């Protein structure tokens, strides 16, 4: 009788593994949405900076009207930002290469500020030739990685992102999907890979910080249970 009473049915609860998987999938979606909107916002901000140089990747009226011919560019940047931001912490876990620095949102915000500054420099500074511009922006981009990342996976992924994004952008231009407003096409190609590299490092840092915050919340919940 005692055994029957102890085995009396009650409301069954999900095991810790199932609840953990569910919460992780929800948090993954939340992180993806946050990264998407951050990417869209940065795309619009950086485009405003490039308008000063008249070399925008999409026409200025894309901000004023959603029916612009290049309305799809900010959502594409947001999607790429979400993928990059989710990919960085995933690769860190698989490679077992934790970040070397104590992560804080203040460091992430400084990284974003430096990235915007690099883009602003590409729009404002005048150089004698495109090689000087490329070398300067490359040094600034590598400096951003060294200051806020320093991981081999981050550098490799940043280089891969820069190469792939530059190739895709040039293919879109060659196929007439959209075109640069600057007549100096070589000038655009001289800074584009560096901007993509710095952008990949920046979104990777944001994604890592969001993932770290998620792990901290899950650990606190499991500790309370």
Swiss-Prot record:
Its main location: endoplasmic reticulum. One of its GO terms (biological process) is SREBP signaling pathway. It comes from the Eukaryota. A motif (KxHxx) lies at residues 219-225. Keywords: Cholesterol metabolism, Endoplasmic reticulum, Lipid metabolism, Lipid-binding, Membrane, Oxidation, Phosphoprotein, Steroid metabolism, Sterol metabolism, Thioester bond, Transmembrane, Transmembrane helix, Ubl conjugation. It is found in: Endoplasmic reticulum membrane. Residues 52-70, 127-129, 176-189 are lumenal. GO terms for molecular function: oxysterol binding. The modification Cysteine sulfenic acid (-SOH) is found at residue 215. This is Insulin-induced gene 2 protein. It comes from Callithrix jacchus (White-tufted-ear marmoset).
